[in-house]
Design a protein with these regions (language model features):
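Aromatic sugar-binding surface patches on proteins
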Residues: 167-179
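Substrate-binding clefts and catalytic carboxylate motifs of secreted carbohydrate-active enzymes
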Residues: 1-158, 166
Length: 180
């Protein structure tokens, strides 16, 4: 956590910013909640990173994206913007494998009309594949499943209409296709 990070500064840089945060929390009787605050805001940051990256990958004719930073900026003015601390160590907010699920050379994406569905509604989605990897994939290589957190499968299928080509994002259901 931020308070524990103070001990990592062993050189000439004095973490006055973190000490001020620690002192402020201590004066307010909230120092024991510092880890909770860090985790809550950090988990939100991870969700927002995912949303931003997926939106970029779904954008037709976009060739990439740039993030402000993945680690906190410790310089002139504190910017605790990263999923990693200023020493590039994990803050425990997201596992590397989970991050690679939405930030990798090949990323499966789902498009749907809204984020909240009622139990009596039919969920409809279109599968997209963002492929900036070295290989081209055929429709016979795509299998998908809609599952819950416990692994219960609600629907599954194959990509008989899908064509995933190199350096393109293509819609599995064929509504739009981006080609060179």
């Amino acid at each position: 956590a931020i308070i524990k990070e103070i001990d990592k500064y062993t050189g000439v840089l004095n973490p006055l910013n973190f000490k001020a945060i620690r002192n402020d929390l201590q004066q307010k009787g909230l120092l024991n909640r510092a880890d909770d605050y860090l985790k809550a805001s950090g988990k939100l940051a991870a969700i927002l990173f995912k949303e931003e990256i997926e939106r970029a990958l779904k954008t037709p004719q976009q060739s990439g994206f740039q993030l402000l930073d993945l680690h906190d900026f410790p310089g002139q003015g504190t910017a605790l913007v990263g999923l990693l601390d200023a020493f590039w160590d994990s803050k425990g907010l997201i596992e590397p494998q989970r991050f690679r699920e939405f930030c990798a050379p090949v990323v499966p994406l789902a498009r749907f009309d809204k984020a909240v569905w009622r139990a009596n509604e039919t969920f409809k989605a279109h599968i997209d594949i963002a492929n900036y990897g070295a290989e081209t994939y055929g429709a016979d290589q795509l299998r998908w499943a809609l599952t819950d957190g416990d692994g219960q499968v609600y629907a599954e299928g194959t990509g008989d209409e899908v064509n995933v080509v190199l350096d393109r994002t293509e819609r599995a259901a064929g509504r739009w296709r981006r080609r060179a």
